[in-house]
């Protein structure tokens, strides 16, 4: 009898459970969910432009358990600049660490600590653009387009010591921009490869300007020029002798206008070969390359400047003969192309 009563009760409870689940399932589920989630919450991270309040997409953040110092989740902001974690235990401390941000914003390296105290928690992380970016706009795709740059490159003149040393003076200005304690004369005398002019069988013999500086940059009459490669080598030798690996030198011959603007937007000044009078190259001089029978024709109005920024239709530069100057962009890049598209960077 007891067995029959027990089985009847069990059957009734089972039937009642099935009935409640079928008729009140949503409420039961909600009650269970509330019970399970009552000690959990989410963290919403908002990534914004510190100056203009633009939401920043594609910002990545690590959520770190402060007690264990373990990364428990990585989140990325959507196009509206918002990212939300999964459920996290309440009453715990967490660190929020930004690991990636859309260019040209600077990474926010602060580690933000907070305690998760409610079901919905929110923190705003701000990012700045570098100070050399003077203006920018937001595109329809929510990217940032830099419209004005001015790099703080100091004016260094080649004269009077280096009447024909615009190339190495331009390099000196770039190294000064990065904080190196060198100067145009040290670079010219100690590091720049040079080949003096000589005469053989009544023929003028000199350097391949892709391999070494032709002549002596200290001389008004015996100095001429080089292209980018010897100046790249000058910087590489300087870094090697001084055991410096913090910067790299790169030949960027053939770069487009867009390529160069992008470099400037990243804070990288560009050493560019143009002409001294901003007119088309006058290729009206020649000599034989030392050690060969090859004769080369070279421009007599070659000049080298440092591009430092841009705005609207203008490009800013440091001219080793004049100091800071402004060029009309279309004209400058036309001359640059005619002069062979020679350029280099240190970054």
Predicted regions and their residues:
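Surface-exposed ligand/attachment interfaces on beta-rich extracellular proteins
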Residues: 256-260
């Amino acid at each position: 009898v007891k067995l029959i009563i027990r089985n009847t009760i069990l059957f009734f409870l089972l039937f009642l459970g099935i009935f409640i689940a079928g008729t009140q399932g949503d409420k039961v589920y909600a009650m269970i969910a509330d019970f399970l989630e009552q000690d959990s919450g989410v963290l919403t991270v908002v990534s914004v432009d510190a100056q203009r309040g633009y939401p920043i997409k594609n910002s990545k953040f690590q959520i770190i358990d402060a007690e264990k110092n373990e990364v428990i989740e990585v989140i990325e902001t959507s196009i509206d600049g918002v990212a939300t974690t999964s459920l996290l235990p309440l009453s715990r401390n967490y660190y929020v660490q930004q690991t990636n941000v859309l260019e040209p914003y600077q990474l926010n390296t602060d580690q933000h600590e907070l305690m998760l105290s409610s079901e919905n928690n929110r923190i705003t992380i701000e990012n700045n653009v570098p100070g050399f970016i003077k203006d920018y706009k937001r595109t329809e795709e929510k990217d940032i387009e830099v419209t004005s740059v001015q790099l703080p490159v100091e004016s260094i003149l080649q004269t009077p010591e280096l009447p024909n040393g615009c190339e190495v003076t331009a390099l000196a200005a770039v190294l000064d921009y990065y904080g190196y304690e060198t100067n145009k004369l040290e670079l010219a005398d100690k590091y720049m490869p040079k080949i003096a002019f000589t005469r053989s069988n009544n023929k003028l013999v000199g350097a391949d300007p892709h391999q070494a500086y032709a002549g002596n940059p200290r001389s008004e009459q015996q100095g001429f020029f080089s292209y980018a490669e010897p100046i790249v080598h000058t910087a590489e030798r300087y870094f090697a002798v001084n055991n410096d690996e913090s910067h790299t030198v790169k030949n960027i011959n053939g770069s487009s206008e867009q390529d160069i603007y992008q470099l400037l937007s990243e804070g990288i000044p560009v050493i560019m070969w143009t002409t001294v009078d901003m007119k088309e190259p006058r290729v009206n001089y020649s000599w034989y390359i030392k050690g060969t029978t090859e004769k080369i024709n070279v421009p007599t109005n070659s000049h080298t400047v440092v591009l430092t920024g841009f705005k609207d239709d203008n490009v800013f530069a440091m001219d080793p003969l004049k100091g800071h100057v402004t060029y009309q962009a279309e004209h400058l890049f036309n001359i640059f192309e005619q002069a062979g598209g020679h350029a280099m960077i240190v970054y």
